[in-house]
Structure formats: C-alpha cells, structure tokens
Amino acid sequence: MTDIVWHQHSIDQAARGAQKSQNPVLLWFTGLSGAGKSTLAGALERALFDAGFHTYLLDGDNVRHGLCKDLGFSLSDRDENLRRVGEVAKLMVDAGLVVLSAFISPTRAERDRVRALFPEGRFIEVHVSTPLSVCEARDPKGLYVKARSGEIKEFTGISSPYEAPTAAELTIDTSRGDLATQVQAMLAYLTAIEVIDANKLSALA
C-alpha cells in the first residue's frame, strides 16, 4: 500500500495541445550510431518550430550532461537511461509539446516500454535504417574504430546487437535521398495523422 496518488489537473493534455494548435506526440528516432538520428530529428524540429509549432528535442548525448550524468554504459545503465528519457518525454507530451527523441535504443523491449507509456497514436517510432556499412564509414565520433579495436565493449552494431523495429510508423534510410526531402516526408506524415495543421506549413512556404 502506498500514500502516493495521482493528482488530477483541471487542464489536460488535449487542452494544452489545442492551445498550441497541435496534437502532442513523441517521435522516437532509433537506429545505429551514425545513422543520422540527431540530424533528422534536428531538421524536423527546425521545420516545425519555424512553422510555429511547439517542440522539444531530447538527444542521447545531451541528456548525459544532466538528467543521466550519473549513468555509465553498462546494459543496466543504458536501460535506466531510456527509462528516464521515456518518463521525461511523457511529461513533455502531457504539456502539449511535439517531442522528438534521438537515441540508439537498441532493443525492441526498451522501445516498447516507452511506447506503453503513451496512448495509441501518441508514440511514433522512426526507424533510421541507414546500413551499418554507411554508419561505419561516416563514424563522426570515431566510435566504430574504437569498437573494432576492442577499446569500446558492447558497442551496438559491432559487439552488441541492434534489434530493428518490425512495425515502425516511419522508416528512413539517410543514405538515400536528401535531408530536405526526408523532412518533407515526415511533415507529410504528421499532417496526415493530424498532429499538425497543414495550413500552418503552407503559410511558412
């Protein structure tokens, strides 16, 4: 038995979203290191922000400077990292925001656990499916070189598995096409499911 109960607010998620002329959701970008998750999420956020939508981007590196700075990279710490991010994202969605997150999140169980925090339609999984060979060739942080040499243990895609989504709402391979086209495809999807109003995008154009 616990004395902790939910405090019901007079203003709900729908009201907060309506005030901002948007339907709040979480877009969860998942994929290998170097796949282009942060680039895609950042470009989409910029397009949404410029059109007048209310957004926030949670990035895998950034949260480790504060929210998760006490965590390492063991399997249990990585799991806790994503648990915290999922809970923070839920609060932000409840606040009426369109939230974007960019995390490798290598297992289906981790991603499904975050999905379970949200009502149907409020969690959008974006699989950034860029092939390992392309990600390794990019290697923007030099992590693949360290993983191949054994300097980094349990590195996703090399010495630790990545479980690709089986039913992602969106799949984007950043080695095909250009960033602007990919952003437009994501905006079209968000418009189709009525997360955002096409009229606001038209006004921006």
UniProtKB/Swiss-Prot annotation:
Pathway: Sulfur metabolism; hydrogen sulfide biosynthesis; sulfite from sulfate: step 2/3. GO terms for biological process: hydrogen sulfide biosynthetic process; sulfate assimilation. Transmembrane segments: none annotated. GO terms for molecular function: adenylylsulfate kinase activity; ATP binding. InterPro entries: APS_kinase, P-loop_NTPase. Keywords: ATP-binding, Kinase, Nucleotide-binding, Phosphoprotein, Transferase. It comes from the Bacteria. CDD domains: APSK. It catalyses: adenosine 5'-phosphosulfate + ATP = 3'-phosphoadenylyl sulfate + ADP + H(+). Belongs to the APS kinase family. Catalyzes the synthesis of activated sulfate. This is Adenylyl-sulfate kinase. It comes from Shewanella denitrificans (strain OS217 / ATCC BAA-1090 / DSM 15013). The gene is cysC.
